[in-house]
A protein has these predicted regions:
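Conserved lysine of the Walker
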Residues: 452
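A short helix-turn-beta junction within AAA+ P-loop NTPase domains corresponding to the substrate/partner-engaging
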Residues: 488-492, 701-714
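P-loop NTPase motor domains
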Residues: 55, 62-81, 92, 256, ...
């Protein structure tokens, strides 16, 4: 392999540096210079890192896995042969104080701390015994020898665009890392036991005459034959010494499935294809020559039927296969090495973890080994500095490199978010912040008993106990009342016979989103009468009469600065009767049942607290006749609460149970569609719950709302619903298994395009559970 060795020697020669014994921990950091855009320099080598997100490889179907594998192979093939690449998986331990500050509910001494303690205990129970304290990140670091920073930047700009494009084909989000983000990786590794400190400020450090190394380096580093010690923690660098003939694609994820701080890196040195082909052709020629010489010797001994020795035949077969890979199957030749560093709090724990890792490698018929007397070089190789100091390289093709695929399962971990369950594959916590999404509206879909209401109530509990946001609930099944009352909220029961009333004409100076509240209210009254006489049946003359009467009814109230008694529909009825037009009497007669008749609940003065931050509108007993009008008044009340809160800078969360009911009536369907599109602008979020997915999807409006929602919780589904959702949301057969005949609280979460299988359980021996459950005998 004269030619190939020459190429490798050239790379080794350029990487070779004079060894200097480090006299301080700062000198042990092999970076010489950094730039704010994230370019690092070590010798004549410049490096740039890209962070990329995980994808759902583990739960993908065989066909999807093949497609992902081929897309990842394309990414590897796109790597420039003039540079080297390092793919790094970083298991980073989450700081306990940071976790508690971001997720646990602080006590407020408002009479609800008992529930906060129960909720916090539930959260802490989900952390213990799982990998929840470990957060995994992925980086791709590209290194290249250039004369100066300008040439390096030009190169990285071109290569970076290519890398991010190929990652997007894999549905992985790639992003460039700046200097602070790259340095944070090393600080988290070297100073993992320290709490999060101030962010790195390059200008401030330069003014003080300090080096960036002071921010990342530990207090001490001690290296021995087969391990090292950083501060009070122990570490060891391993490398892949021998590979199996066939490696399964889950080996990398299994090697990283250890609840410890660790990093695994795969260094890749691509070889120019033309050079690789020439070398393999020369090697094949050498093999054929050896076979010919062997046969000639056998013929000279009159052994004309001798079979070519197995080792020669195998060598010829493998060389031909390699040449075929390079020339007809678009494979590239590359050198690679896999290194891994893991950390522990004690030497005993370190040795135990090392044995666990070696055992995983043996399971895959591979052999990992400890780097003896090379722990410094090994550490500098495995960390994403962009350099390689270990030269135990293995010749690989694109396929054999791609099988070391760095993907496993998507995670959802958004700081400051709400807990929604655990990843069914990795058991990691799923924490999402709907406020950070482009469209934070949500649907929860599932058959009866699948856990829809429980999931919504859990979210309501978190919001009620951790924020000052307003929570408004449309409750057609009377399922939320007990919880709302326990959280010091207000339950407004609306029916023809209830003792609680909502005045349909309630209005204050903040009503609507207009400078003139009267205009908004006049439009509402027109909509109200359209519900009474039938949509489209109001004539222009009747609309004019209603507008005139509305102004008359509110005149004194507005003059008093909205301080006098609020008018009711009865006042409007009397005003209509005073009008000279015959149409006015017709309008009064059409509305008499709902104003002076037996269904006059919305013609009374409001006698409940509509200012409470948590309100459940119980419309179970509304009845078919009163439902359209009841929906209109209730939704008007909800929307105006959203507008008023927006003007105060306050967030509003709306939960609508049995969402499909809203689409039986054109007004409520149109209202929620408009609300869905506009509410983000008003700092509001809508959540729809339903078990009748098929009926909901009969509405094109509902289908559009569902398809455009960035946050969905899909629980156990009926067969017909499952098929509809699979088409609408592009769910694969494997993913559908997570919403097929599964228990309560299990399913799929879709967040920002990520589709993650989850499971969610809550301790039954708690007051919160009894408030949230709807199971008979447990309430």
């Amino acid at each position: 392999m004269v030619r190939l060795i020459k190429t490798l020697q050239q790379a080794l020669k350029m990487d070779r540096e004079k060894f200097k014994v480090p006299r301080s921990v700062q000198q042990a950091i092999p970076i010489q210079r950094i730039w704010p855009d994230g370019v690092f320099q070590s010798g004549t080598k410049f490096s740039k890192s890209f962070r990329f997100s995980d994808i759902n490889y583990a739960i993908a179907s065989k066909e999807d896995k093949t497609e992902m594998f081929l897309d990842y192979s394309e990414l590897l093939n796109a790597l420039d042969s003039g540079a080297s690449a390092k793919i790094t998986l970083n298991n980073r331990r989450i700081n306990k104080e940071e976790f508690e500050a971001s997720l646990l509910l602080p006590m407020k001494e408002d009479g609800l701390d008992e529930y906060r303690k129960e909720y916090n205990e539930m959260l802490l129970s989900k952390v213990s015994g799982t990998n929840n304290s470990i957060y995994q990140e992925r980086y791709l670091t590209v290194s290249v020898h250039k004369k100066n920073i300008d040439e390096a930047r030009t190169y990285f700009a071109r290569v970076g665009t290519d890398i991010i494009t190929h990652l997007s084909k894999l549905s992985s989000i790639g992003e460039e890392m700046d200097a602070e983000q790259r340095l944070q990786i090393f600080r988290d590794f070297f100073r993992a036991e320290e709490p999060q400190c101030f962010p790195f400020d390059m200008k401030a450090f330069a003014k003080k005459g300090s080096s960036f190394k002071d921010w990342i380096c530990p207090q001490s580093m001690e290296f021995s034959k087969d391990c090292f010690k950083i501060n009070e923690r122990f570490g060891r660098v391993l490398y892949m010494q021998d590979y199996a003939s066939y490696v399964k694609d889950d080996m990398i994820s299994e090697l990283c499935d250890l609840s410890r701080d660790l990093m695994l890196s795969i260094d890749i040195l691509p070889v120019p294809t033309d050079e690789a082909v020439r070398e393999i052709q020369n090697r094949l020629l050498g093999v054929e020559t050896n076979v010919t010489n062997w046969q000639r010797r056998q013929n000279a001994n009159n052994n004309f039927s001798a079979i070519v020795p197995y080792d020669m035949e195998l060598q010829r077969k493998e060389t031909k296969e390699m040449l075929d890979d390079l020339t007809t199957r678009d494979q590239r030749m590359m050198f690679g090495i896999l290194t891994m560093v893991h950390m522990a709090d004690s030497k005993k724990q370190l040795d135990s973890d090392t044995e666990s890792i070696l055992s995983v490698a043996r399971k895959h018929l591979c052999q990992m080994a400890t780097l003896k007397w090379q722990q410094v070089d090994g550490l500098n190789t495995v960390l994403p500095y962009g350099i390689r100091k270990i030269n135990a390289l293995r010749t690989l093709t694109t396929e054999s490199t791609a099988v070391l695929i760095p993907f496993h399962t998507q995670e959802i971990m958004q700081p400051g978010g709400i807990y929604y369950g655990q990843n069914a594959v990795s058991k990691n916590m799923l924490v999402a912040d709907r406020r950070k999404l482009l469209n934070g509206n949500s649907f929860r879909l599932g058959v009866s008993g699948s856990g829809k209401s429980f999931s919504a109530k859990e979210e309501i509990v978190d919001l009620a106990l951790s924020t000052e946001d307003d929570i408004l609930i449309l409750d057609p099944e009377s399922e939320f009342g007990s919880l709302v009352e326990a959280l010091n909220g207000e339950v407004i029961s609306i029916s023809a016979t209830s003792h609680t009333h909502l005045n349909a004409l309630d209005m204050d100076s903040a009503y609507g989103n207009d400078k003139n509240p009267l205009i908004e209210k006049s439009e509402f009254i027109l909509s109200l009468f359209e519900q009474l006489v039938g949509a489209g049946n109001l004539s222009a003359k009747e609309k004019s009469i209603l507008d005139r009467c509305t102004a008359d009814v509110y005149r004194e109230y507005i003059r008093s600065g909205y301080q006098s008694e609020v008018p009711t529909l009865k006042d409007l009825y009397r005003q209509l009767m005073l009008q000279p037009e015959e149409e006015a009497r017709g309008l009064a007669l059409s509305s008499e049942l709902f104003i002076n008749g037996s269904l006059n609940t919305f013609a009374q003065k409001t006698n409940v607290n509509t200012k409470n931050r948590i309100i459940a509108y119980d419309i179970r007993e509304l009845g078919e006749q009163l439902m359209p009008l009841g929906m209109l008044v209730t939704l008007d009340s909800i929307f105006n609460r959203v507008i008023q809160n927006w003007k105060k800078g306050k967030t509003t969360w709306i939960f609508a149970d049995e969402f499909y009911l809203l689409f039986r009536y054109q007004y409520s369907a149109d209202f929620f569609y408009r609300l869905y599109k506009r509410i983000r602008k008003y700092q509001g979020f809508v959540t729809g719950l339903t078990q009748n997915v098929e009926e909901l999807l009969k509405s094109d409006t509902a289908r559009l709302m569902l398809a455009n929602s960035e946050f969905l919780i899909l629980l156990n589904q009926a067969t017909t619903d499952r098929d509809e959702l699979a088409v609408l949301l592009n769910i694969s057969e494997n993913q559908l298994s997570y919403i097929t005949n599964v228990g309560a609280g299990k399913g799929l979460i879709r967040c920002s395009g990520n589709l993650v299988p989850f499971e969610n359980s809550f301790p039954k021996n708690t007051k919160l559970y009894r408030l949230m459950t709807t199971k008979p005998g447990e309430c």
